[in-house]
């Protein structure tokens, strides 16, 4: 359900409807695929949007698991930040895209609380 309201500065703030979220996730997946190609392993939606308890101030948390060494991921951060900004403006939301190397995620997914939370509450995005 799309929620609209005006704050004290008469600035419109909104959250994304289910249809808008699906479109945003498809477009995010496609954009990440264009950056990483076959090295993009999985994309996960996690946090309040995955749990369904988001509000108008919530950001949209996304984790991209990439089959590259973590040292190489640094080269892609600017490009991913730019695509995130483009999608922020298009959908009038705040995306928070975390790049994560697949090896570290797999190695620590049973021990690190953050990774456990992504696995427990997250939703895997499929193209």
Residue spans for each PLM region:
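Short beta-strand->loop micro-motif that forms the acidic, two-metal-ion catalytic signature
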Residues: 61-65
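Catalytic core of pol beta-like nucleotidyltransferases
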Residues: 1-39, 51-56, 67-127
């Amino acid at each position: 359900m799309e929620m609209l309201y005006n704050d004290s500065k008469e600035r419109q703030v909104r959250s994304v409807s289910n249809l808008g979220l699906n479109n945003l996730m498809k477009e995010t997946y496609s954009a990440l695929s264009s950056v990483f190609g076959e090295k993009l392993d999985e994309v996960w939606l996690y946090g309040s949007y995955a749990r369904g308890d988001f509000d108008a101030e919530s950001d949209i948390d996304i984790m991209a698991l990439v089959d590259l060494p973590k040292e190489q991921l640094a080269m892609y951060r600017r490009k991913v930040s730019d695509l995130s900004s483009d999608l922020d403006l298009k959908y009038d939301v705040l995306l928070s895209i975390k790049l994560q190397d697949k090896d570290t995620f797999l190695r620590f997914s049973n021990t690190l609380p953050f990774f456990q939370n992504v696995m427990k509450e997250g939703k895997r995005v499929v193209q």
